[in-house]
Amino acid sequence: MLRFAPSPTGDMHIGNLRVAIFNYIVSKQLKEDLIIRIEDTDKERNIEGKDKEILEILNLFSIEYKTVFYQSDNLKYHQKMALQLMTQKKAFACFCSDEKLEELREESIKKGIPFRYDGFCENLSDEAVLNVNAPFTVRLKKPDHNIKFTDLLKGDFDYAPFDIDSFIILRQDKTPTYNYACSVDDMLMDISIVIRGEDHVSNTPKQIHIRDSLGYTKEIKYVHLPIILNAQTGKKMSKRDDASSVKWLIEQGFLPSAIANYLVLMGNKTPTEIFTLEEAIEWFKIENISKSSAKFDIDKLRFINRKHIENLDDMRLSKILGFADGDIGKLGKLFLEEASTIKEIKEKIEPIFATKTTLEGFENEFKSIKECLQKATYFDNYEDLKNYIVNETSLKGKNLFKPLRYILTGVENGPNLSDIYPLIKNYLGDIIK
């Protein structure tokens, strides 16, 4: 069993989508189920509706999964297992106030050492604990041995007890912390492999320690994917980068298939540059992912997006553009030398159907050609249409072609009219209205 475990705290980041895609591909290769686990236990950070948005994006990218699970639904198990750990003296009630902990942090900063809990509450007697009438958290005792694990990408890791510390597993309101809820749920769901971002590497020994403390012996394999950098700045893709948001990329007109293609391609060894997710399932190897940070280049994505638009069926592209006519799909592809996204193609097509009243500098010619076209019969090809206008108006050169292009396309430059006309001829009545 594999899981994709996003938090509903904001727009989906391309790094999270990459994690989802890799989990999907590997689940297909291993013929194991993929579940979506919405990690919603941090109520203060949750944003209403973001869970639904996550699922909509996954469906848009055709990422198949068995079921959707909300982490908060497991609260009773989180609390029950925490009580078990306390009963077994593997965890303890911590009454230390936020103020005291902050003082300890400040002392650590002054000494130039990492902050670690001082263990004050760990040795309180049962009687002392019962006599304290104050809110408390639950801390898991630090391990008495090193925690080791092997990452399928990054190799071996070895953490000393000092690195792991005695950490909180239940907050004062008795909701679970991230590492604790994650560990318990991975146990309950029988997760076999965890694929996630490298920012979780330091969480892994804590999660292993939690499972060890609960007597869970099944090994879970780990893959921690390198972070994604902005190719222009060399810095980590953050919320300040518009392109870090999957929602923004979709709104800009990037096809889901192209985005998925690029996220798999980045920092990877692939047999071809342009492919679909289904094709990637046939050859993808998680161990081929580079250990170095991947670089997100929006221009490279634009190139890949053009290729995916080119590969679309004409009717399919037409429907994406808001029509149901294969000729409009062909028209959209005509603009790919100048446009790279669906949004940009729409911006090229919209002027064709806009109302045009005149063309500055060619007012009389514009009027003559438009009146001529309004009286004209149907012409199947551009040459016949052009010859008809020449015969009716005696116009030629730029006096003919500039206003004619503007009437037919709404712009003064673009692909050849001989290429455009066959694709818009059936809409001529709407165009010259």
From Swiss-Prot:
- Enzymatic class: ligase
UniProt: ATP binding residues: 239
Q: Which GO terms describe its molecular function?
A: ATP binding; glutamate-tRNA ligase activity; tRNA binding
What this protein catalyses is: tRNA(Glu) + L-glutamate + ATP = L-glutamyl-tRNA(Glu) + AMP + diphosphate
Query: Where is this protein found?
Result: Cytoplasm
Q: Could you tell me the keywords of this UniProt record? A: Aminoacyl-tRNA synthetase, ATP-binding, Cytoplasm, Ligase, Nucleotide-binding, Protein biosynthesis
Entry GO CC: cytosol
Where is the motif named 'HIGH' region mapped on this chain?
A: 6-16
Reported EC number(s) for this entry are: 6.1.1.17
- InterPro entries the UniProt entry points to: aa-tRNA-synth_I_codon-bd_sub2, aa-tRNA-synth_I_CS, aa_tRNA-synth_I_cd-bd_sf, Glu-tRNA-ligase_bac/mito, Glu/Gln-tRNA-synth, Glu/Gln-tRNA-synth_Ib_cat-dom, GluQ/Sye, Rossmann-like_a/b/a_fold
| Chief place of localization | cytoplasm
Where is the short sequence motif 'KMSKS' region located? 236-240
Instruction: Specify the superkingdom.
Output: Bacteria
Q: How does it assemble?
A: Monomer.
Main function: Catalyzes the attachment of glutamate to tRNA(Glu) in a two-step reaction: glutamate is first activated by ATP to form Glu-AMP and then transferred to the acceptor end of tRNA(Glu).
Q: Give the family, as the similarity comment puts it.
A: Belongs to the class-I aminoacyl-tRNA synthetase family. Glutamate--tRNA ligase type 1 subfamily.
Under which name does UniProt file this protein?
A: Glutamate--tRNA ligase 2
Q: What is the lineage of its organism?
A: Bacteria, Pseudomonadati, Campylobacterota, Epsilonproteobacteria, Campylobacterales
